[in-house]
Each structure stands twice: as C-alpha cells, then as structure tokens.
Amino acid sequence: MKLTPKELDKLMLHYAGELAKQRKAKGIKLNYTEAVALISAHVMEEARAGKKSVADLMQEGRTLLKADDVMPGVAHMIHEVGIEAGFPDGTKLVTIHTPVEAGSDKLAPGEVILKNEDITLNAGKHAVQLKVKNKGDRPVQVGSHFHFFEVNKLLDFDREKAYGKRLDIASGTAVRFEPGEEKTVELIDIGGNKRIYGFNALVDRQADHDGKKLALKRAKEKHFGTINCGCDNK
C-alpha cells in the first residue's frame, strides 16, 4: 500500500482524533492539539460517509466540544478550524468558526490586560532639544533606537550634544526629515550599559568620556557635518 503525503497527514489526524475521543470519554480535559484533532477527524469521517453537507458539518462541528471538555484557555485559542474533507462529489473546505464556546473562563492565554490610563514614555529620563536640518535632496528617516550621533551625515546639527543619545519617541517608531526641512527633536540617553556598536562605526565601544573624544575625531574625519572636536584632522 502506497500513501501520498496528504493521505498520511489525514491518517495521522485520524489517529490523533481517535486518541482525543478516548481521552474525552475518560473525562480528561483536552489540550489545543487534541481539541482540533477531535473536531477535524469527526468532520472528515462524516464527509466520507456522504450523508451530510458542508453546511451541516459547519454547524455540527460547533457542538462536539464544550468549555468543560477542554483545558482552561483552550477555547480562547481556537478561533476557527478549517478542514479539507473528501465528499462523494469532491474535496471541500469545511470551516468551523468558534468551535468551542469560551464559557465562564475569562482569561485567555497570552492576553494582555492594560490599565485604562495614559502611559508616560521614557519616564524619569532627561531630554535635550536639538535643531536638525536635512541638507540633502532625499528624505532621511531615523528610528527610535538609532544612535542619533551617527545618523546620516547630511543631517546638520550639533553632533556633540547627540553623543550617547536616541530619539525620545515610542519604540519602533521613527522621525522623518524631508529634503531641506528643519525641525526640533528631543533626545534622551541610551539605556543599558551604553556599549554602542555598529551604525556608522563612529563609536564601537563604551560610550564614555574617552569614547566621545574618539567618536568626534572619527566623525570629523568622515565629514559628518561641522564638528569641533579639538583634534587634528590629518
């Protein structure tokens, strides 16, 4: 007997469904995989019998399990179950929405419950204002955690004040500078141990006082705007 990969998958699903059915009969609460397998195996078997339509099985699939049949939180995890079942007139997709009613369980796995109040970003961090102008002919976008000292060299501003700092904006957001545009931004200190690597390779070390001197020298050598570093540009 030779089986295609799809037939093997269906056979494994049938085994899993039968095992789940046996555990349910013993009063064992089903986990996510077992619940999906039980519903899927039942739908495939009924479709093969050919006595029920897709609509019938979509409705029937919602009656196989109750909240008490599954582990806490499982009902919230199964939003829908889709099964490609073989009917006498061909393969059809049977989609069962909300196959297990949540019942009285109010907590869902991974759910985040937020307070109904505003959140202060970067609370307690001192911010400095910096006027920045884009002298280039293309837009420049700077992300929230980019070391602002090392941004595009066509952005003109006091780079010394930006050393060891990033934009005071929400994580994952950015500020866009259009060509010729000048705007004021707020910067805060980069958190953590302040070891800054990568970006434009102007620091690549601890962002301390000695590192600042070296970074300013590198920035001047690489023409990152007008920089007064007190160093010789050789």
From Swiss-Prot:
Transmembrane feature ranges: none
One Gene Ontology cellular component: urease complex
SUPFAM superfamilies per UniProt: Urease, beta-subunit, Urease, gamma-subunit
Sorted UniProt keywords: Cytoplasm, Hydrolase
Alphabetical list of InterPro entries matching this protein: Urease_beta-like (IPR002019), Urease_betasu_sf (IPR036461), Urease_gamma-beta_su (IPR008223), Urease_gamma/gamma-beta_su (IPR002026), Urease_gamma_sf (IPR036463), Urease_subunit (IPR050069)
Location of this chain's protein in the cell: Cytoplasm
One example GO MF annotation: urease activity
GO term, biological process aspect, one: urea catabolic process
Region of interest called Urease gamma, as start-end residue ranges on this chain: 1-102
Keyword DNA-binding: no
Region span, Urease beta: 103-234
Recorded metabolic or biological pathway in which this protein acts: Nitrogen metabolism; urea degradation; CO(2) and NH(3) from urea (urease route): step 1/1
Stored CDD domains: Urease_beta, Urease_gamma
EC identifiers of the protein: 3.5.1.5
Main location: cytoplasm
Catalyzed reactions: urea + 2 H2O + H(+) = hydrogencarbonate + 2 NH4(+)
Source taxon at top rank: Bacteria
UniProt subunit comment: Heterohexamer of 3 UreA (alpha) and 3 UreB (beta) subunits.
Family membership noted in the UniProt record: In the N-terminal section; belongs to the urease gamma subunit family.
Protein name: Urease subunit alpha
Organism field: Helicobacter heilmannii
Organism classification: Bacteria, Pseudomonadati, Campylobacterota, Epsilonproteobacteria, Campylobacterales
